Amino acid sequence: MRKTSPLLLTSLAAALALAAAPAMAQSKGDWTIGAGVHQVAPKSNNGSLAGGTLKVDVDNDIKPTITGEYFIADNLGIEILAALPFKHDINIAGLGNVGSTKHLPPVVSLQYHFNSAGKVSPFLGAGINYTTFFSEKTGGALAGSKLKMEDSWGLAAHAGVDFAINDKGSLRVDVRWMDIDSKVKLDGEKIGTVNIDPLAYGVSYVFKF
């Protein structure tokens, strides 16, 4: 269930205040580590189950994240995203909350950084996402049933801006899109696919070494 993220607006305002800081250039062989927080906001329409009779809605969640990026060339890096498990409540129209699940969505991306020697450096990336679901629980109208959500592979896109704090660190504001579609089983029977396809808004501190 996608909503406007106050986290993104607040972090963008803070980043603009740092625009006068020294630049953090990124060259071949450099490594960066980023630590921050992201809100995973599934798209507003998460699909239907049981032949289209049950409309699904998956809630947002926010958790700490970490990234590591290695620059294979000047301005061009390979990044890995990891996070603490995100937890989402699952709602069905007319039935309310019927369960929850946790997931981990690691992403590997190839990213190009524009103006990496400047104080403000936007970047774009594309890659692959693998999402694993676990700790599924049921409640409400589905209490007592066994819910299983299958793992998912999909494409991912990444865009953001780095605002240099000094020559070793920057404040990053970014947004990701991930293609996450999970086949759902209830008591061992396939009942459809949940289309999560979230945007992940975030802010982090990125350190170069």
Q: Language-model features: where?
A:
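A broad helix-preferring feature
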Residues: 22, 154-156, 162, 202, ...
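Outer-membrane beta-barrel translocator domains and adjoining extracellular loop/strand segments
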Residues: 45-52, 89-97, 134-144, 178, ...
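Hydrophobic alpha-helical segments of small multi-pass membrane proteins
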Residues: 106-108, 125-130, 151-161, 175-177
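Predominantly the C-terminal beta-signal and adjacent terminal strand-loop region
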Residues: 87-91, 100, 166-209
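Cleavable N-terminal export/targeting peptides
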Residues: 1-29
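Gram-negative (and chloroplast) outer-membrane scaffold detector with strong preference
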Residues: 27-30, 39-43, 67-140, 198-209
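N-terminal targeting signals for Sec/Tat export/insertion, comprising classic cleavable signal peptides
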Residues: 34-64
